[in-house]
Amino acid sequence: MHFFDTHTHLNYLQQFTGEPLSQLIDNAKQADVQKILVVAVKEADFKTIQNMTALFPDNLCYGLGLHPLYIQEHAENDLILLEQALKNRDTNCTAVAEIGLERAIPDLLTDELWAKQCHFFESQLYLAKQFNLPVNIHSRKTHDQIFTFLKRIPLSKLGVVHGFSGSYDQAKRFVDLGYKIGVGGTITYERANKTRQAIAKLPLDALVLETDSPDMPVFGFQGQPNRPERIVESFKALCTLRNEPAELIKKLTWENACQIFS
């Protein structure tokens, strides 16, 4: 079994480091990261990500979506363009991503922008339902609101609540709906006690691994762009929190990811 990095912005990692895409993928493969999901944050990413993944279809797949952090930039027409892109998608497109809600940034919490966030999230959930695709969800200080949307709009393919940070009870509600929990760099920090306890208690078949590269640096690499190969650090941290053998953890997190995004 291998590693599947279920959440990256590989296009931005390449832009940030200036390294050839082939080198980024080789580095990942040396750490046994055989599959990488590249997710969009705005409409301008769509073509870049499609072209990038077409070069390495055995290792890369992608998701198209409109991220809540960029809600001020998103136009209503972007939802139309997203629908068109999903309708014309190739087989490398395996998710609607990255979508979600954001309440950690005060500037995005005006009544107008919060309503727009909710509208874009709901619209993209319906697109995922329409095209029978899973979702990869951003949730920051919005677990209750996200849960309400997911319960109201059931999807056939479900998906992942990515980069989870929160309590066991919050995570368990998503798991009970059938969603997976994205485990990333947060658990490499001992101070993230609540999240570490949650990940330790959840069923292993509810977990997938991710890096969110170039974001969410793991402990020991603060201040550096995160990379798919550093999924190994999150895996090691996960193994210290779980009672299962490391090989079983690797096997099931791989299979869980493939079940959703392959």
UniProtKB/Swiss-Prot annotation:
UniProt xrefs under SUPFAM superfamilies: Metallo-dependent hydrolases
Positions of transmembrane segments: none
- Top EC class of this enzyme: hydrolase
Instruction: Indicate yes or no for the key word Flavoprotein.
Output: no
User: Which sites bind a divalent metal cation 1?
Assistant: 7, 9, 98, 212
Keyword Ribosomal protein: yes or no?
Answer: no
Q: Name one GO cellular component term.
A: cytosol
The cofactor(s) it depends on are: a divalent metal cation
Q: What's one GO MF term for it?
A: metal ion binding
Q: Which UniProt keywords apply?
A: Hydrolase, Metal-binding
Q: Where does a divalent metal cation 2 bind?
A: 98, 138, 162
Q: Which InterPro entries match?
A: DNase_TatD-rel_CS, Metal_Hydrolase, TatD-like
Q: How is the co-factor bound, per the entry?
A: Binds 2 divalent metal cations per subunit.
Tell me which EC number(s) this protein carries: 3.1.-.-
Sorted alphabetically, which PANTHER family does this protein's record hold? D-AMINOACYL-TRNA DEACYLASE, HYDROLASE
Q: Which family does it belong to?
A: Belongs to the metallo-dependent hydrolases superfamily. TatD-type hydrolase family.
Name used for this protein in its record: Uncharacterized metal-dependent hydrolase HI_0081
Q: Which organism is it from?
A: Haemophilus influenzae (strain ATCC 51907 / DSM 11121 / KW20 / Rd)
